[in-house]
Swiss-Prot record:
The keyword Repeat applies. Self assembles to form an icosahedral capsid. Most capsids appear to be large particles with an icosahedral symmetry of T=4 and consist of 240 copies of capsid protein, though a fraction forms smaller T=3 particles consisting of 180 capsid proteins. Entering capsids are transported along microtubules to the nucleus. Phosphorylation of the capsid is thought to induce exposure of nuclear localization signal in the C-terminal portion of the capsid protein that allows binding to the nuclear pore complex via the importin (karyopherin-) alpha and beta. Belongs to the orthohepadnavirus core antigen family. It comes from Hepatitis B virus genotype C subtype adr (isolate Japan/Nishioka/1983) (HBV-C). Homodimerizes, then multimerizes. Interacts with cytosol exposed regions of viral L glycoprotein present in the reticulum-to-Golgi compartment. Interacts with human FLNB. Phosphorylated form interacts with host importin alpha; this interaction depends on the exposure of the NLS, which itself depends upon genome maturation and/or phosphorylation of the capsid protein. Interacts with host NUP153. This is Capsid protein. Residues 155-176 are annotated as: 3 X 7 AA repeats of S-P-R-R-R-[PR]-S. The modification Phosphoserine is found at S155, S162, S170. It holds the Pfam family Hepatitis_core. Residues 177-183 are annotated as: RNA binding. GO terms for cellular component: host cell; host cell cytoplasm; T=4 icosahedral viral capsid. Sequence repeats lie at residues 155-160, 162-168, 170-176. It comes from the Viruses. One of its GO terms (molecular function) is structural molecule activity.
C-alpha cells in the first residue's frame, strides 16, 4: 500500500523528493526545533491544527522506530544483520521522518502556501539546466514581498485608509459603554 502522507496538505512525496537528503536537518535538530517552537501545542490535549497532529504522529513514529532499533540491537545476535537493520532504519526511515518533520515545522513557521511555493520553485530550479538557472537555489526564509503570513484569528492591519472612506476632522466619538462587549 502506497499512502502519500502529504496529500491532504496539498503536497506529495514526489514534490519533497526534489530536495536532496542532506537538505534536511538531523532528526535531533528537527525535534529540538519542533519542541522549542510548538511544545505547548504538541503536548496539549486539544486539537490545534492538522500540522500539529501530523507532527505528533511523526514524533511518536520515530520513538517507536527507536524502540525497534534498540530491541534489534539487543536481540539480534549476528552483527552483520544487526548493522543492516539499524542502517536501513536510519537511512530510509530516518529520511522519511526528517522530511515529514521539516515539512510540518516549515508549514507552521512560514505557512503552507509559502512552503508549497518553495517546493515548486526548488523543483523548477533543480530541473533547469545549470547554464540557464541562477547560481543559488531558492531560500525558504526569503519570503516574497507579496506573501503575507498571518497568525490565526487576527485580521491584517491596514496601512492606509480606504480611499472611499471619508476622514472627519472632528475627534472620534466613542460608542456607549452601556452595551456589553461582543466577541
Amino acid at each position: 500500500m502506497d499512502i502519500d502522507t502529504y496529500k491532504e496538505f496539498g503536497a506529495s512525496v514526489e514534490l519533497l523528493s526534489f530536495l536532496p537528503s542532506d537538505f534536511f536537518p538531523s532528526i535531533r535538530d528537527l525535534l529540538d526545533t519542533a519542541f522549542a517552537l510548538h511544545r505547548e501545542a504538541l503536548e496539549s490535549p486539544e486539537h490545534c491544527s492538522p500540522h500539529h497532529t501530523a507532527l505528533r504522529q511523526a514524533i511518536v513514529c520515530w520513538g517507536e522506530l527507536m524502540n525497534l532499533a534498540t530491541w534489534v540491537g539487543s536481540n539480534l545476535e549476528d552483527p552483520a544483520s544487526r548493522e543492516l537493520v539499524v542502517s536501513y532504519v536510519n537511512v530510509n526511515m530516518g529520511l522519511k521522518i526528517r522530511q515529514l518533520l521539516w515539512f510540518h515545522i516549515s508549514c507552521l513557521t512560514f505557512g503552507r502556501e509559502t512552503v508549497l511555493e518553495y517546493l515548486v520553485s526548488v523543483g523548477v530550479w533543480i530541473r533547469t539546466p545549470q547554464a540557464y538557472r541562477p547560481p543559488n537555489a531558492p531560500i525558504l526564509s526569503t519570503l516574497p514581498e507579496t506573501t503575507v503570513v498571518r497568525r490565526r484569528g487576527r485580521s491584517p492591519r491596514r496601512r492606509t485608509p480606504s480611499p472611499r472612506r471619508r476622514r472627519s476632522k472632528s475627534p472620534r466619538r466613542r460608542r456607549s459603554q452601556s452595551r456589553e462587549s461582543q466577541c
